[in-house]
């Protein structure tokens, strides 16, 4: 892929009339413009044209004069920012750094890790990596190729490179911020020099990331002076207009249209088909994107939490400079459902709990305990009274829940559909519910407001070639994006074959969207459907077993250029499917295990093997 200062890719071309004009833009700018306008409808294009005209009149895009023969890189160097992102958090931090660098007069450019060629690091002077970690220490899908290149013997020596790494992760996991640690080590091994110490940021990363960016910029101001690059200023403005003005920080207040249980009466699971009305928002999304949902904590849980530490909820606290009651802060701003190791260790110290202190000294036992308990369970381990400040110091800030979108806008218009598995279980005789899933399933009435935003996922997209075959593996709620894929392929009249592999517990109770799949089979949009219901026979059968059973056909489709998609559980299913795919390639391709692993790795690099796992 050509190196471009972009974060989206389409493969479309500019209208002939525009392409024929004598362009004052350089190649990078023209390519960025091309990839942006092809995403917009006529109304959006009209708005954008007016927006840029207004900017030109207000000199909002004015840049220092560059004389003939002088290049935009005439400053003492430039900053290259590379993001490795799975859910969009790293991308957001990288975009913020880009904007701040440009405002400081630093020439800066931004790259998706999948669009950056590792060998080009030898040409750089200053690079910042912002990297999230996927699953159990894996690099995000968009960074797999770069990650592999930098640890290989092909990577160039980098004695002239100065760098910084910001890692994003979740300390609940064993391999916390592993991808950031990897990039930091790779660059050090290649002879690069650290500008600043690596930051390993936890789930509530915003404040720490902001301070780290300030530290980086204070150093870069001394090292990178001169005019900001024309391409950087212009391309940032264009990329901003290509996105909806609604975001994680500024969500859209939509309304809940439908919350319908789609598992049977006797199912052990409650799975909901959710429809949300986006009318008049102007929000657009593509198959493969996710919807971020901001939720409120249940009043019953808030009250139980307050009671467990001897507080009334009327205490006043400061949240983001605003004075709120403690009850309101816990309802809207803090994570009070999922426990985490840091919470357990801090509460052990506050409560002087021998049991929890002993537990905190065993990392594996601590992690296991935090996984199976909720915040309320930890606080009830010891009967102590806390102040409001002490309680909030234990808690993480609330973060939105991301759900794979289960609809295509070409089919549903100004709606967005989700497939939500309600988290519900018992702990020591008491019911425990998930925060976001119970909010959507139980707390909201139809017509109630819900704050949402679209999180684009460029690492889980339909191929631009409508003739390409698709193999889609989506057990349980992992079926969601493939509903959007099939809707989109039908509406586009795509000729490519479609094969779906679905699995769950039982055929009669857990076959999600069964009627729809049968309709698509009958119409020919879906060419093949294989199912695995684990509890319908003595021996449990899962989707990976169906793959192995159909190994010859899987290999045939791959040889025909099929794209292979997996969505769902990262801890077991995705790993088992991955190993099954390698086995298929090994057996059917006549390769040894190492060669089969390399083949599958090449599929991922070519974006013919894409995963949306959690």
UniProtKB/Swiss-Prot annotation:
Catalytic activity, as annotated:
hydrogen sulfide + 3 NADP(+) + 3 H2O = sulfite + 3 NADPH + 4 H(+)
Q: Which InterPro entries match?
A: CysJ, CysJ-like_FAD-binding, CysJ_Proteobact, FAD-bd_FR_type, Flavdoxin-like, Flavodoxin/NO_synth, Flavoprot_Pyr_Nucl_cyt_Rdtase, Flavoprotein-like_sf
Domain Flavodoxin-like as annotated: residue spans: 79-217
- EC number of this enzyme: 1.8.1.2
Q: How is the co-factor bound, per the entry?
A: Binds 1 FAD per subunit.
Give GO MF terms, alphabetically: flavin adenine dinucleotide binding; FMN binding; oxidoreductase activity; sulfite reductase (NADPH) activity
Source organism superkingdom: Bacteria
Q: Which residues bind NADP(+)?
A: 534-535, 540-544, 576
Keywords, in A-Z order: Amino-acid biosynthesis, Cysteine biosynthesis, Electron transport, FAD, Flavoprotein, FMN, NADP, Oxidoreductase, Transport
**Residues annotated as binding FAD:** 337, 371, 401-404, 419-421, 425, 434-437, 614
Instruction: Decide whether keyword Amino-acid biosynthesis is in the record.
Output: yes
Protein family according to the UniProt entry: Belongs to the NADPH-dependent sulphite reductase flavoprotein subunit CysJ family. In the N-terminal section; belongs to the flavodoxin family.
Cofactor(s) listed in the protein's UniProt record? FAD; FMN
First-level EC class: oxidoreductase
Q: Name one GO cellular component term.
A: cytosol
Which pathway does the record list?
Sulfur metabolism; hydrogen sulfide biosynthesis; hydrogen sulfide from sulfite (NADPH route): step 1/1
Q: Which residues participate in FMN binding? A: 85-90, 132-135, 168-177
Q: Assembly state and interactors?
A: Alpha(8)-beta(8). The alpha component is a flavoprotein, the beta component is a hemoprotein.
Spell out the CDD domains in the cross-references.
SiR
A single GO BP term for this record reads: sulfate assimilation
Q: What does this protein do?
A: Component of the sulfite reductase complex that catalyzes the 6-electron reduction of sulfite to sulfide. This is one of several activities required for the biosynthesis of L-cysteine from sulfate. The flavoprotein component catalyzes the electron flow from NADPH -> FAD -> FMN to the hemoprotein component.
Q: Does the keyword Flavoprotein apply?
A: yes
* Alphabetical list of NCBIfam families matching this protein: cysJ (TIGR01931), PRK10953.1 (NF008197)
- Listed name of the protein: Sulfite reductase [NADPH] flavoprotein alpha-component
Q: Which organism is it from?
A: Vibrio cholerae serotype O1 (strain ATCC 39315 / El Tor Inaba N16961)
Q: What range(s) does the FAD-binding FR-type domain occupy?
A: 249-463
């Amino acid at each position: 892929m050509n190196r471009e200062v972009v974060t989206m890719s389409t493969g479309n071309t500019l209208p002939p009339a525009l392409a024929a004009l004598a362009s004052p833009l350089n190649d990078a700018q023209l390519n960025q413009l091309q990839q942006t306008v092809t995403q917009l409808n006529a109304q959006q294009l009209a708005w954008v044209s007016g927006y840029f005209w207004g900017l030109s009149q207000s000199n909002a895009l004015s840049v220092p004069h560059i004389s003939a023969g002088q290049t935009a890189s005439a400053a003492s160097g430039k900053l290259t920012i590379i993001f490795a992102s799975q859910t969009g958090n790293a991308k957001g931090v990288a975009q913020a750094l880009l904007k701040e660098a440009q405002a400081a007069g630093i020439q800066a450019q931004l790259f998706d890790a999948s669009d950056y060629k590792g060998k080009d690091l030898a040409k750089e002077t200053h690079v910042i990596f912002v990297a999230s970690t996927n699953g159990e220490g894996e690099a995000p899908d968009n960074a797999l190729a770069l990650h592999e290149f930098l640890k290989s013997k092909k990577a160039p020596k980098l004695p002239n490179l100065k760098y910084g790494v910001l890692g994003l992760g979740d300390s609940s996991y064993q391999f916390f911020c592993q991808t950031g640690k990897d990039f930091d080590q790779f660059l050090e091994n290649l002879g690069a020099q650290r500008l600043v110490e690596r930051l390993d940021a936890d789930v509530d990363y915003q404040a720490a990331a902001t301070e780290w960016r300030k530290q980086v910029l204070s150093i870069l101001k001394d090292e990178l002076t001169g005019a900001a690059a024309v391409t950087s200023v212009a391309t940032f403005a264009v990329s901003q207009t290509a996105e909806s003005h609604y975001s994680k920080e500024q969500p859209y207040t939509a309304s809940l249209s439908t919350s319908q249980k789609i598992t049977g009466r006797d199912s052990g699971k409650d799975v909901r088909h959710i429809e949300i009305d986006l009318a008049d928002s102007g929000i657009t999304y593509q198959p493969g994107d996710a919807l971020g949902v901001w939720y409120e904590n249940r009043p019953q849980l808030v009250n139980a939490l307050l009671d467990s530490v001897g507080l009334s909820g009327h205490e006043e606290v400061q949240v983001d400079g605003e004075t709120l009651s403690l009850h309101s802060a816990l309802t809207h701003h803090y994570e009070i459902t999922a426990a985490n190791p840091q919470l357990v260790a801090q509460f052990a110290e506050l409560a002087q709990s021998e049991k929890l202190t002993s537990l905190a000294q065993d990392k594996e036992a601590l992690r296991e305990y935090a996984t199976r308990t909720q915040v309320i369970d930890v606080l009830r381990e010891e009967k102590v009274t806390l102040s409001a400040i002490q309680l909030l110091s234990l808690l993480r800030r609330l973060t939105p829940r991301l759900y794979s979108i289960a609809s295509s806008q070409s089919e549903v218009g100004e709606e967005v559909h989700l497939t939500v598995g309600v988290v519900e279980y018992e702990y020591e005789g008491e019911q425990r519910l998930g925060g976001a899933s119970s909010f959507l399933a139980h707390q909201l009435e139809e017509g109630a407001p819900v704050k949402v935003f679209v999180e684009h996922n460029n690492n889980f997209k339909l191929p631009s070639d409508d003739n390409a075959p698709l193999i889609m593996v989506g057990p349980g709620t992992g079926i969601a994006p493939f509903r959007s894929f099939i809707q989109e392929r039908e509406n586009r009249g795509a000729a490519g074959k479609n094969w779906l592999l679905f699995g769950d517990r039982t055929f009669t109770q857990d076959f999600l969207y069964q009627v729809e799949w049968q309709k698509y089979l009958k119409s020919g949009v879906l060419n093949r459907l294989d199912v695995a219901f684990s509890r319908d026979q003595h021996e449990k059968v899962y989707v990976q077993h169906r793959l192995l059973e159909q190994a010859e056909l899987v290999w045939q489709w791959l040889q025909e250029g099929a794209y292979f998609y997996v969505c769902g559980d990262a801890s077991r299913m995705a790993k088992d499917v991955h190993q099954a795919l390698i086995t298929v390639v090994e057996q059917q391709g006549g390769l040894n295990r190492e060669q089969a692993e390399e083949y599958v790795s090449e599929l991922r690099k070519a974006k013919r093997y894409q995963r949306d796992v959690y």
